[in-house]
């Protein structure tokens, strides 16, 4: 990559599988007359130095790395210091990724979530403050989830049944809060589970069938939405966007046997955007392409509105 020049949009990632997604964003940006630079771990040190020196500049940073890779946080800090627009800034990601916080916010907003018990971190409260009787409303088995340790079900216990299971899980990430959560059983018909993943990208909602057991996507068609009364799914994603304050995220929603839409996995702030055409468990290509198009369009709109460099810290 060139370490010199002025760019409208910088794309940063520490995950090699973001390559196809970034290629689509670059293509969409070019169609809108936006220049781009992609920053990978191998480029980070030189890029950061070039940005400090002023030999490399960008107006917007789409940062897929800083929340999980501390070495990228410095670049975001530098960008913030120069009042660049950051999509999405670290403080917004931290707020949205806290499952305990989102659970309470969702309930306050009238969204339906699984029955949940929230526990303080083991390090500060070794005694969970609950008894075996308190587990009864969760059913058996139930989930044990760290509130802030995210990505690929990291730290999640899928088949907990006892207080001993809870205590063992809490010791895995002793500085994190934990959620004990009932299993939501989705409606099933003709072998299809009514479990969905919704995507929010800069004011636009998309959704797909997503099997929580196989982790495979299937296109959700307008005919599906009409036939099964799935319109509320899209409104739920919009309401979550208003709560979490991210420009781009995904969420999981299940339609249960009682006809209720239940938000089962709150805000995925680091969406896996591998293409289905390249990976069996990837996201449908049409969704990924639309996200790329929405991102590029959002960047162009924000730059046009600001007249250049942004003084705004994050998405609203």
Regions flagged by a language model, labelled:
Residues 13-125:
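Conserved N-proximal alpha/beta basic substrate-recognition cap immediately N-terminal to
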Residues 142, 179, 206, 249, ...:
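Protein kinase-like catalytic core scaffold
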Residues 157-241:
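Phosphate-binding site of ATP-dependent enzymes
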Residues 246-258:
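A short glycine-rich, hydrophobically flanked beta-strand micro-motif that places a catalytic Asp/Glu
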């Amino acid at each position: 990559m060139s370490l010199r020049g002025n760019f409208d949009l910088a794309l940063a990632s520490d995950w090699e599988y973001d390559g196809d997604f970034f290629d689509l964003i670059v293509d969409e940006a070019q169609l809108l007359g936006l220049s781009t630079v992609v920053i990978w771990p191998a480029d980070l040190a030189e890029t950061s130095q070039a940005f400090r020196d002023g030999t490399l500049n960008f107006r917007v940073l789409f940062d897929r790395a800083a929340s999980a890779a501390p070495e990228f946080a410095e670049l975001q800090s530098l960008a913030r210091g120069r009042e660049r627009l950051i999509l999405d800034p670290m403080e917004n990601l931290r707020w949205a990724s806290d499952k305990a916080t989102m659970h309470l916010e969702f309930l306050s907003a009238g969204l339906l979530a699984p029955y949940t018990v929230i526990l303080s971190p083991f390090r500060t409260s070794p005694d969970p403050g609950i008894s075996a009787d308190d587990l009864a409303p969760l059913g058996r088995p139930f989930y044990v989830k760290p509130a802030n340790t995210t990505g690929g079900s990291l730290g999640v216990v899928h088949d907990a049944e006892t207080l001993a299971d809870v205590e063992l899980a809490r010791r895995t990430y002793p500085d994190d809060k934990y959620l004990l959560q009932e299993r939501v059983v989705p409606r099933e018909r003709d072998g299809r589970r009514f479990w969905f993943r919704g995507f929010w990208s800069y004011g636009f909602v998309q959704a797909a069938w997503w099997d929580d057991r196989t982790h495979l996507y299937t296109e959700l068609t307008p005919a599906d939405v009409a036939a099964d009364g799935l319109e509320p799914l899209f409104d739920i994603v919009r309401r979550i966007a208003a709560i979490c304050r991210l420009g781009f995220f995904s969420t999981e929603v299940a339609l249960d046997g009682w006809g209720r839409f239940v938000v089962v996995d709150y805000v995925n702030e680091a969406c896996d955007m591998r293409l289905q055409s390249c990976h069996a468990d990837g996201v449908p290509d049409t969704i990924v392409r639309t996200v790329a198009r929405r991102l590029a369009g959002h960047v162009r709109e924000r730059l046009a509105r600001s007249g250049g460099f942004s003084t705004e810290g994050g998405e609203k």
